[in-house]
Amino acid sequence: SKLIFTREESQTASTPRHEMEIHLRLGANKDGRIRGLDLYTLSNTGAYGEHGPTTVGLSGHKSIPLYSSAEAFRFTYDVVYTNHMSAGAYRGYGATQGLFAVESAVNELAAKLHMDPFKIREMNIVHEGDVMPAYYGAVNTSCTLDRCLAKVHEMINLSLIHISEPTRLALI
């Protein structure tokens, strides 16, 4: 059997993603080397908290390790029950909210330092063989983030060749 909802029914009957308010402080040298990350997440789990603690935890536990070159990091959070529909599990399961905040902060850092955001990421992202402090000193034995980032950079540069510099930087 198959159940097909209209758009309105889907919005009424399904669970929303966890609403999160994220405060992030990013510390870096003038050359763009990230020295510290301080992330606080306030998560609205709705009226019931089946996924509340897990989801909010992933907003920091999946985003901070991407920049493992940082010498200091802190992740704190609160989960609140509200008079809203309970939030459910979706792809990314909390990580997407944290990643959006961290990547937005990296873009803001790049703008402030007048640097290419890809250059800052290349200098700071986790690489294969790196020790990952956020994962209790485990060694990263499998990671192709650097190659993925290089491919994205290539694809974006090819698609933005005919766009003016200020517009191109705003899009990246």
Indicate where each model-derived feature is located:
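Structural alpha/beta core scaffold segments of enzyme domains
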Residues: S1-S164, R168
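Short, ordered, surface-exposed loop/turn motifs in non-cytosolic proteins
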Residues: A170-I172
